[in-house]
Amino acid sequence: MKKRNLMVALLCSMCLAVSSPVPAMADGTKVVTLGADLTQDQKNTMMNYFKADSSQVQVITVTNQDERDLLGNYVPSEQIGTRTLSCAYVKPTQSGGIKVRTANLNYVTCNMIATALSTAGVNNCEVVAACPYEVSGTGALTG
């Protein structure tokens, strides 16, 4: 199982590195990705959970089509599902490597997210990937 997760993480990160549909984060820019299928109340809950102010972060909406475009060849369709709900908060740092923590994700792991960021050239950041309730986390990985 660990070998399979590592393989999925590597494949996802390669896919993300070459075909990301969302703007790349500039050095020092904090980014929040929100699942397109969250209600406004759920989006507000996630922004509060991340302690992020929408006027001070770049907010990107991730759709189920984004997930399918980026992960469809590597992640089982039943893990991607039909709605995008998970979110991520990325805060660039000056040192310390890539630190990831998750909440309510049952498929995507911290290692998958860290590998995708590393492959995309990110060296130092803090990431929180989460959802208001348990989901696979492919939306957060896509973001």
Q: Whereabouts are the PLM-identified features?
A:
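C-terminal segment of classical bacterial N-terminal signal peptides
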Residues: L16-A24
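N-terminal secretory signal peptides that target proteins for export/translocation
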Residues: M1-K2
